[in-house]
A protein has these predicted regions:
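Glycine-rich phosphate-binding P-loop
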Residues: 153-181
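Gly/Ala-rich beta-loop-alpha elbow adjacent to hydrolase catalytic centers
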Residues: 363, 367
Length: 611
């Protein structure tokens, strides 16, 4: 066993079983070595549970079957196992059947501790069972947190060009340089093998990797925290090896090229027995000012987890890719709250000034609209000025109509979103999503592709205030009715930390009357000096606040799962108080700046962005 792998497994044994030094070494020496090829199953869900395994080399995936056999639901990926971690603890304790299946992403080596050997050690160390049970509880907590293992401890990444890529060499150099600022990194291409002393003669068209080359690659992986495999342009033995060895695959496409998957790409990545490694698409554009369009043509027909845009030699976007690979990218979630959402504009400026990167944006209602503006990647000044034009000068809340479908026609809102936020979601420089709900059954919709303005029209269609939006011949309404702070959706993305801005209020509404006054009494109180004045919320405020009530508990629950929750003091502002735009933005900025400074002082993993 290589030194680094030995130390990782030894540390895991000590952590799980609470034994040290010679006892831990003795347990390690008593483990049996197991080799498993990429794509093969270590065991399947429902198999007899009779052993615990420690991963020495490679990477594994945890899969669970749908609860109802034969249902339309597909097996679900729970997470990934990385070197030094263990699998099968529950089975060793209970002796039942496997609650999940374990499949190798790439060729992997494990050490096996069977029940008999475990019981032998338990006699010598009575606390072994309790120590293992505690370790299981901790691991279950880690593994059930959404997104927690998305890019955790990647050891190998394959860069696979989808055609001629004259920019590839420069990109590899910049990517490797950025990674080396963080961890020990080695970049390997077919041209590098001979220079580095690899047994290149061992390469063959066969899928299996010859032993001499396998040992050479293992040594490189042991000496470096991360290996970057650069595949050839096309189907070659080296390209096959790169894909087979990868924990994660980055498909590299030139935005101006033919987006249709080639025959060799389909064969290597999507045929039976192909790798199950996570994959993402990186689309290269000539320069930062190049328009992004037709991304959907690259996404169709490809099974990818996410995609990113790389404009020219942008250091900022190269750094975003690095953060995604290292598991410390930042997702920003913006909640709904009508005019109080202007505070999110200020929070964004505070993040930008503090150097906090934004690698993914998601939001609901007003948060979705502001989030889409942020995803254009034009900076805080652009977002502030265009938000002011849209909501203060555009007056979308003053578009009253005959209240048949709603109080507001929604024409102004539609016109504003069409004008300021054109294009498709998948073409945005920063990945984005927003939330809406189906009117007929309340099912949540996550908008990640298609027309930006249509998605925003849906996420902000507050029932009673604005007419429902039409999406695929279904009526949809404001996402605040089902998920007003979609941190859970962001946790499913490849982000390491989540910053959320919650602009809902906990204010108590108290009145000085026992029965609701009539509309005429309210009007009289406003017009006639000697009449009693009644403090009552307007119909729009009632509609907006009512929409929040149903998800208030969920918002509080979601907020606990954010790494940084920013709650600007905006309760003094009304839900339609667009005239206070600048004051609300300032309130969000001041509060966020203070909270961000505290957060960054405590979490050294927050890496300032590269502009």
């Amino acid at each position: 066993m290589q030194n680094r792998a030995h130390d990782q497994v030894l540390e895991t044994i000590e952590r799980y079983f609470g034994i040290r030094d010679d006892d831990a070494e003795a347990m390690l020496d008593g483990l049996d070595s197991v080799d498993i090829a990429g794509g093969d199953w270590l065991f399947k869900q429902g198999a007899a549970a009779d052993a615990l395994y420690f991963l020495v080399r490679g990477r594994l995936q945890v899969w669970v079957e749908p609860e109802v056999r034969g249902s339309e639901s597909a097996p679900r990926l729970l997470g990934e196992i990385t070197p030094g971690e263990s699998v099968g603890e529950i089975g060793l304790l209970t002796g039942g059947v496997r609650t999940a299946g374990i499949r190798a992403i790439r060729d992997s080596q494990l050490l096996r501790l069977d029940r008999q050997a475990f019981e032998h050690f338990a006699v010598r160390h009575p606390n072994l069972v309790m120590q293992l049970a505690g370790g299981v509880a901790r691991r279950l907590t880690e593994r059930t947190r959404p997104g927690s293992s998305a890019s955790r401890n990647l050891s190998t990444v394959a860069l696979v060009p989808l055609g001629e890529s004259p920019w590839l060499a420069d990109f590899c150099d910049r990517l490797t340089d950025e990674l080396r600022k963080r961890v020990s990194t080695l970049c390997l291409s077919s041209a590098d093998l001979g220079k580095d002393g690899a047994p290149v003669d061992a390469l063959s068209p066969e899928d299996s990797i010859p032993g001499s080359l396998h040992r050479w690659l293992d040594a490189r992986e042991n000496d470096h925290r991360l290996l970057i495999y650069v595949a050839d342009e096309g189907d070659t033995p080296w390209s096959r090896l790169c894909i087979r060895q990868a924990d994660m695959i980055l498909l590299l496409g030139d935005a101006g090229a033919d987006p249709t998957p080639s025959q060799w790409e389909t064969q290597l990545l999507d045929s039976d027995g192909a790798t199950t490694a996570r994959r993402a698409l990186i689309l290269h554009h000539p320069d930062r000012d190049s328009p992004i369009a037709d991304t959907i043509q690259w996404l169709e027909g490809r099974d990818i987890e996410f995609h990113l845009h790389l404009r020219g030699d942008s250091d900022a976007e190269t750094s975003r890719i690095v953060r995604m690979l290292m598991g410390d990218s930042v997702g920003l979630v913006l909640g709904g709250g009508a005019a109080r959402g202007f505070a999110e504009v200020g929070a964004y400026r505070a993040m930008h000034e503090a150097g906090v990167p934004i690698d993914w944006v998601g939001g609901t209602s007003i948060g979705g609209i502001i989030g889409a503006a942020i995803a254009l990647d034009q900076g805080p000044d652009y977002v502030t000025e265009n938000s002011r034009k849209a909501f203060v000068e555009g007056k979308p809340f003053g578009d009253y109509t005959l209240p048949v479908l709603s109080l507001i026609r929604g024409r102004r809102m539609e016109k504003l979103t069409r004008h300021h936020l054109q294009g498709n979601i998948e073409d945005l420089p920063i990945p984005f999503f927003c939330i809406s709900a189906l009117l007929d059954n309340g099912e949540m919709r996550v908008h990640e592709r298609g027309s930006i303005w249509r998605a925003l029209r849906a996420t902000a269609a507050l029932p009673g205030m604005l007419p429902p939006a039409v999406m695929e011949q279904r009526l949809v309404v404001d996402g605040s009715t089902v998920n007003n702070l979609p941190i859970d959706i962001m946790r499913e993305k490849p982000v390491g930390r989540v910053v959320a801005v919650d602009v809902t209020t906990r204010r108590t509404y108290s009145v000085d009357y026992d029965d609701m006054p009539s509309p005429w009494s309210v009007i009289a109180g406003k017009l006639i000096p000697w009449k009693q004045r009644y403090r009552v919320p307007g119909v729009i405020s009632v509609l907006m606040k009512s929409a929040e009530i149903g998800t208030a508990a969920r918002v509080r629950e979601m907020g606990r799962d954010a790494d940084l929750l920013i709650r600007p003091p905006v309760s003094e502002f009304g839900l339609t108080d667009v005239k206070s735009f600048d004051r609300i933005v300032e309130a969000g900025y001041d509060h966020a700046r203070e909270q961000i400074a505290k957060w960054m002082s405590k979490d050294e993993r927050v890496m300032p962005r590269s502009d």
